[in-house]
Amino acid sequence: MATEYALRMGDGKRIFLTKDKIIEELEAGMANASDLGEIPDLSGDEIDKLAEILMMPGKAVSVEQGMEVPVTHDIGTLRLDGDQGNSGVGIPSSRLVGCMMHERAFGADTMELGHIDYSYKPVKPVVANECQAMEVCQQNMIIPLFYGAMPNMGLYYTPDGPFENPGDLMKAFKIQEAWDSMEHAAAHLTRDTVWVMQKLFASGADGVNFDTTAAAGDADMYGTLHAIEALRKEFPDMYIEAGMAGECVLGMHGNLQYDGVTLAGLWPHQQAPLIAKAGANVFGPVCNTNTSKTSPWNLARAVNFMKAAVQASSIPCHVDMGMGVGGIPMLETPPIDAVTRASKAMVEIAGVDGIOIGVGDPLGMPISHIMASGMTGMRAAGDLVARMQFSKNMKIKEAKEYVAKKLNVETMDLADEYVMRELREELDIGVITSVPGAAKGIAAKMNIEKLLDVKINSCNLFRKQTR
């Protein structure tokens, strides 16, 4: 009797498959991506490698040593203090505590601050509060700290916003009116996002994370691209990450273009050049999980799409890997076996430059991803590599080589806690444990500026405030 391996369905349910069935599912998932995106198939060796990863006996697996990548985040501290019946675990804690827990306890390479409503439009009335929270976090933290939220263009339609819902207009065959409504909403999205980030950047934010770009279709992406363009023009040194909502841009409008390219119907490898053109530093491509398909089918499909996106992108790609995307099951408590296998496959086969950790409970998301493929932040040198990706648009190999040269170590040492623990204390660039007298917060970041030859926004703010 053939050996069966414990795997998952796209909804997280455990199933058992033989090796032959795993290969069959991998090839079918890959073929689906190839057909839809008109991209090359994975090679036979890559399919075999995927099967090998899926059949590994351990519950948790990880990348080969030396292949670790930085992680970025969606939803910020909401996975800790959120309590809405989804993936938040409802721990009463401040956002400062939540951010520092990710930095000090989880070994995150970067982190983000976000509002409980997690969209840019609701931030407007409370932006002063967000600015104060950002300032306090930046004074205490060392890893790059973004402000993150969703463009969420749906909030600009009735009953939540000023413009009539284009879905209702289209049902009434008022097509021109629907187009006008989407275009007006996109303009407001651009305006509001830029305004919010002007305030947050003035309060020391390292940058901005656009989470779930194009959730409301091509007009949502249109508004976001123009927001990125405006922010890049005004703030040349702002870190900008643009993550997508889905694998294909829905053509709700159908006629909108950016840089002469129609946005409707774009797949990840076609989205990447436009995100870079607008001025983002890092692109977060997405592949949606099909809950009625197996994990091999979903993972091969996701890896194939992401490999094509990485090859088409001139900027680093941090693949979105929350629940329901990137080959990960759609479950609030994502199974650790599925998460770590998907994380390893994305790094070793798709060649991604980083992982954007998305929705899911703390153990199933940040802890699992960081254990599987992360650089462990300040425990080693993950925060430094991430800074170079965002400061200079460096892909993972170049960023690691740059940092290793500055530290006078080998690239493999960048994720070695033993090497980096002593080196970080010697250079006074911040250590993860509480050492009396060691540089912390702004002081440590000022030393990082000198080491890496970069400018850090919170340090610039501090310098302006001193007399």
Swiss-Prot record:
EC primary class: transferase
One GO molecular-function entry: dimethylamine methyltransferase activity
Tree of life domain: Archaea
Enzyme nomenclature, EC number: 2.1.1.249
UniProt entry keywords in alphabetical sequence: Methanogenesis, Methyltransferase, Pyrrolysine, Transferase
Pathway field: One-carbon metabolism; methanogenesis from dimethylamine
InterPro entries referenced in this protein's UniProt entry, alphabetically: Dimeth_MeTrfase_MtbB
Catalytic reactions of this protein: Co(I)-[dimethylamine-specific corrinoid protein] + dimethylamine + H(+) = methyl-Co(III)-[dimethylamine-specific corrinoid protein] + methylamine
GO biological process: methanogenesis; methylation
Family according to the record: Belongs to the dimethylamine methyltransferase family.
Role of this protein: Catalyzes the transfer of a methyl group from dimethylamine to the corrinoid cofactor of MtbC.
UniProt-recorded name of the protein: Dimethylamine methyltransferase MtbB3
Encoding gene (name): mtbB3
